[in-house]
Regions:
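Intrinsically disordered, low-complexity terminal and linker regions enriched in polar/acidic
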Residues: 1-7
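Periodic aromatic/glycine/histidine/acidic cluster detector
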Residues: 2, 18-161, 165-185, 189-209, ...
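Bacterial N-terminal signal peptides
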Residues: 7-17
């Protein structure tokens, strides 16, 4: 955070230099024809200001929207993005903040809705999704929260309703569902639960009424219904029985 603050301060001072015309010599090359010193460049609709050393970008580079509002604050080391890269919309609101090492995402990448409201937090380690991934609804409530290892889901992932309640919870191992698969009612009670092995339901399945009483019971084998499946009313009386074999209804 200290590094980010210093970078922003440097950007502020550089803005003062540009606006006051303090930097007189721009877009110069050295005796070997390599870019050196302070440069102004244009890329698409963005004007960029920053320094070159030995033909490589160095330090803080600042981009501007066509309306004069800062669009980007990017840190460079020997021509590669290293440090924070910050993006700002035309209204001046922060909408993306990434961390880089040698032009590779490393650390948290944070995105924002219009108005700088948090949209997502995703953790990278040298370009690979490793760690937390958290998504938000526009009102700030969590939409999804889980963990990754080598670009694959690993551990518990939860999805949330717009009211903030957990709606679905799966357990992953190396990108595949291995462990409990659960769904929930808005009151927090379990709606359904079953184990999974390599993305397939396996073993006992249970589905409940919102008050917690058992509604449906059955069994899966390799992702297919097997044996007797029973449906109960809220008094616990069996009101329906079906028999399956290899996923096919037999009676």
């Amino acid at each position: 955070m200290k590094k980010l603050v210093l970078g922003l301060l440097g950007g502020f001072l550089l803005c003062l230099n540009v606006s006051a015309g303090i930097v007189a010599d721009t877009n110069k090359t050295d005796a070997n024809g390599k870019k050196s010193g302070f440069w102004k460049e244009r890329s698409g609709q963005t004007d960029w200001y920053g320094d070159y050393e030995n033909n490589l970008k160095e330090g803080l580079w600042i981009g501007y929207h066509s309306n004069g509002v800062i669009s980007n604050l990017d840190e460079y080391k020997k021509g590669k993005r290293t440090g924070y890269c910050i993006s700002v919309d035309k209204s001046g609101f922060l909408y993306q903040k990434d961390q880089y090492v040698n032009d590779t995402l490393n650390g948290f990448c944070i995105a924002y809705f219009t108005g700088a409201k948090l949209r997502s937090e995703i953790e990278y380690k040298m370009g690979v999704l490793n760690g937390l991934k958290r998504l938000y609804y526009s009102d700030g409530k969590k939409q999804e929260e889980g963990y990754f290892k080598n670009n694959l889901r690993h551990g518990i992932t939860r999805w949330f309703t717009s009211d903030g309640a957990v709606s679905v919870e799966y357990t992953y191992v190396d990108g595949k569902i291995n462990g409990k698969m659960k769904t929930f009612f808005k009151n927090g009670n379990i709606n359904s639960e079953v184990n999974a092995v390599d993305n397939q339901e396996e073993g006992e399945y249970r589905e409940y009424f919102e008050n917690g009483k058992l509604k449906i019971s059955g069994k899966y084998v390799h992702g297919k219904k097997e044996g007797a499946w029973k449906e109960m009313n809220e008094d616990g009386k069996v009101v329906k029985t079906e028999v399956y074999k290899n996923g096919e209804l037999k009676k």
